[in-house]
Amino acid sequence: MAIKNHILGFPRIGLNRELKFALEKYWSKKNTLEELLLIGKNIRKENWKNQIDSGMDYVTVGDFAWYDHVLNISMMINNIPERHNPNNHILNIDTLFKVARGSKGVDNNICSASEMTKWFNTNYHYIVPEFTSNQKFYFAWKQILEETDEALSLGYKVKPVLLGPLTYLWLGKVKNSKINKLDLLKKILPIYIQVFKELSSRNINWIQIDEPILVLDIPKNWKKEFQSTYKFLDGKIKILLATYFGDITHNLDIINKLSIQGLHIDLVSSKYDLLKLSKSINNNFLLSLGIINGRNIWKTNLLEWFYKLKDFMKINNNFWISSSCSLLHVPLDITIEENLTDFVKSWFSFGIQKCLEISLLSQVLQNNLDIKELKNWIKPIHEYKSSNIVNNTSVQKRTLKISSEQFIRKNEFSVRSKIQKETLCLPVLPTTTIGSFPQTSEIRKLRLDYKNKKINQLDYEKQIKIHIKKNIIQQEQLGLDVLVHGEPERNDMVEYFSEYLEGFVFTTYGWVQSYGSRCVKPPIIVGDISRITPMTVMWSKYAQSLTKKPVKAMLTGPVTILCWSFPREDISKEDICNQIAISLRDEVLDLENSGINIIQIDEPALREGLPLRTHEWNNYLRWAVKSFKICSSGVKNSTQIHTHMCYCEFNDIMPAIVDLDADVITIETSRSDMELLEFFKTFKYPNAIGPGVYDIHSPNIPSVQSIEKLLKKALKYISIQQLWVNPDCGLKTRNWTETSLALQNMLQATLNIRKEYFKK
């Protein structure tokens, strides 16, 4: 019997977000490159130690990234947009950051960052590779070798990991050219061979190559390339081909013909019959079984898996046990949590605990530990199910009573829009922001002091109102048409709302990486959800009292709250979403009754939640759209409902977006140079739309000319009566200098376009 333990990847930000703080200090020139590199090295060292101490046979190397692991491959093969490296200089870490964050080029011209979008259906974001004609690729960035040498020098058995060449090409975009991405394979594969040779010379036996596109419905020409690609790569080192996030049975005909030595399958995302599945897989492959959920934080029922694997061992006793996918998507360590009770903590496994689960199951299977260890491990699972925290009968009854009348607006958009124009009196090309304003150190300290009970509620509310007043004054001075209160009271767009909802619990240190230095702390849904008290009414009502201009209230939508939380697993996502939607409906109606005429319900995760297989889309979109409409449809015709979406491809779900029936939708488009709007050549969007005119994720200040250019491009596809003007996203991560200058330019560009329009 030979069972090995490993994981596909490990959280990379450090126990206390050391990577985040080191990056931000480096970008603001508050620490040196040497200091940054040392912190990265220490994080990797600690990660590998944690894996070995938790019983892994291999340490996974190559999962660390300064910004993003897809960008690591772009650096490795020298796929750097010319604007960021016009003279083809030797690459360094600053090149990487220029691609990710944008920079100033020759003559102080702004070089835009590469696009950023969601990694499959997760809340992690990757930097989209750009492909152009006549690119020259070579082995330019040797991070994978340097980190392998680091781990070897510490005496570890190393399993390197790289994103596979076909998935890398699939995720990229062709820019200003008509090349076929697959034609680039012949240029890229020799670099992978170079890496394999280097690793082989270091006596590395296995390399993990991630090809998650094998869970998708990939076209025939892509399927065809898999066989020739892996035949080309065969021979230098054993390949463990890793698939995750879904079912691969529809692509087994290709996979079984590949020249690989091992196959990782995600047994969590798709509920396979393991015995049946194994009989349909090439019996020459070593199987890596992904049985520990890498995307959620609940303990695994190891006893259930013990019996399944005992049966499996009757036909195959040579396999590996692993996480379903990289543990990048979960926090690092549950044991450091201070504000959860031991009873609640016992339900969860974070990154380190997931490694322990793999090891524990492996040891019992190999008779090194008694089965009672598994029974003890799963006791909290049974205690959770019977806990009074979980079930709320009044919530369940209200959810069952949802009727079709509750998710239909009183009149169609053409009727509503006329009434809203009379109510709001907005100009052509109305200007607004997405919601948040800079979260200064003063604001963060204020919230922390209140949380730690250093100031009382009365003083806290007084100080928050001072910040709201500053935000309103600033916006009026700038000349924005629709104002926001700026969200100084909000720590996070999901956590803030979940704190007002029964059914959630919260961690103190449960951070996960979203992109680069951006980390989020997802709340955990443990029970039925209901609103405890109004969540935003007081702040929006106060902001509206300060101005005659309309103030827009901001809520996070039900799908996004679901997708950006760790959900419970005992009921369906549809049921969870409906519970959230009912709570938000109550909030929307309270806002309307308080005199708020514009209410924005953000759904940036709508596309992210889409299943990876197209045949499952309709069912998901049915309940996702329904949940939005439950929130939004109880209002009067005069109340304008907005929604906001970012980081995603909208075109394939545009009918569903229309079905939301929001009066105004704002979307992120600036990084793609309004590319998303190409869809509107053939599709007439019926309601109003605000494509983002500048990238808030970059510190670069957009020029008036660049914004005018984007607005003119948008006007080719959208009528001026439908078009709104706004940044791509909220401004919480920017400072006030950047924010003011960018908004000034946005408003000037809008005035220029208005003048030009009225001259015609």
Curated annotation (Swiss-Prot):
Sites where the protein binds L-methionine: I434, G435, S436, E487, D602
Catalysis performed (reactions): 5-methyltetrahydropteroyltri-L-glutamate + L-homocysteine = tetrahydropteroyltri-L-glutamate + L-methionine
Which residues are responsible for catalysis?
H697 (proton donor)
User: What cofactor does its activity depend on?
Assistant: Zn(2+)
EC numbers, comma separated = 2.1.1.14
Residues the record lists as binding Zn(2+): H644, C646, E668, C729
- Keywords in alphabetical order: Amino-acid biosynthesis, Metal-binding, Methionine biosynthesis, Methyltransferase, Repeat, Transferase, Zinc
So where does 5-methyltetrahydropteroyltri-L-glutamate get bound? Answer: R17, E18, L19, K20, K118, R518, C519, W564, E608
Q: What class of enzyme is it?
A: transferase
Pathway, per record:
Amino-acid biosynthesis; L-methionine biosynthesis via de novo pathway; L-methionine from L-homocysteine (MetE route): step 1/1
Q: How is the cofactor bound, in the record's words? A: Binds 1 zinc ion per subunit.
Annotated L-homocysteine binding sites: I434, G435, S436, E487, D602
One MF term in GO for this entry?
5-methyltetrahydropteroyltriglutamate-homocysteine S-methyltransferase activity
Q: Which domain of life is it from?
A: Bacteria
Sorted alphabetically, the Gene Ontology BP terms of this entry are: methionine biosynthetic process; methylation
Q: Which Pfam families match?
A: Meth_synt_1, Meth_synt_2
Q: Does the keyword Methyltransferase apply?
A: yes
Matching PANTHER family:
5-METHYLTETRAHYDROPTEROYLTRIGLUTAMATE--HOMOCYSTEINE METHYLTRANSFERASE (PTHR30519)
Q: What does this protein do?
A: Catalyzes the transfer of a methyl group from 5-methyltetrahydrofolate to homocysteine resulting in methionine formation.
Q: Which family does it belong to?
A: Belongs to the vitamin-B12 independent methionine synthase family.
Q: What is this protein called?
A: 5-methyltetrahydropteroyltriglutamate--homocysteine methyltransferase
